[in-house]
Amino acid sequence: MRVVVIAIGRLKQGPERELAERYRERFDDLGRKLGFRGPEIHEIGESRARDAPTRIAEEAAAIAALIPDKAVLVTLDERGDSLDSAGFARKLGGWRDQSTAQAIFVIGGADGLSPELRRKAKLSVSFGAATWPHQMVRVMLLEQLYRAATILSGHPYHRA
């Protein structure tokens, strides 16, 4: 199963980018043994429109252009479901076991995601009630993807 992360905003050089890349590489290495490919990262520049509704609409159009019809869409949203790591791993493993071609994880910009994208999502995940910078959300998502792979493989990284 191909795993894709679409993120509004670009990670600049620095510790966040290095940490994100470390978890991306770890997932790629372990994930291949489990039937996963990726994660591919697609960065979309933030809209420069003057008002939030226009920014959300422009960003949603750019995101939608990267999502094939049959992909499983997962949004990262503060209104989403709070999953523990084992539950997240079960979701990911379940999609793989159902021969899902792609799981696409979407991280919105500062104004959030469009209601239409949120409705299309098979799952919406929250990393808690707090609002997080998109750079941190990307690192946390990539870490959870790696952690899910370790859970699915029985690797001792996850010690819950």
UniProtKB/Swiss-Prot annotation:
Specifically methylates the pseudouridine at position 1915 (m3Psi1915) in 23S rRNA. Homodimer. It comes from the Bacteria. It is an enzyme of class 2 (transferase). Its main location: cytoplasm. It comes from Rhodopseudomonas palustris (strain BisB18). It holds the Pfam family SPOUT_MTase. Gene3D superfamilies: 3.40.1280.10. It catalyses: pseudouridine(1915) in 23S rRNA + S-adenosyl-L-methionine = N(3)-methylpseudouridine(1915) in 23S rRNA + S-adenosyl-L-homocysteine + H(+). Its EC number is 2.1.1.177. S-adenosyl-L-methionine binds at residues 76, 108. SUPFAM superfamilies: alpha/beta knot. HAMAP family: 23SrRNA_methyltr_H. Keywords: Cytoplasm, Methyltransferase, rRNA processing, S-adenosyl-L-methionine, Transferase. This is Ribosomal RNA large subunit methyltransferase H. One of its GO terms (molecular function) is rRNA (pseudouridine-N3-)-methyltransferase activity. Belongs to the RNA methyltransferase RlmH family.
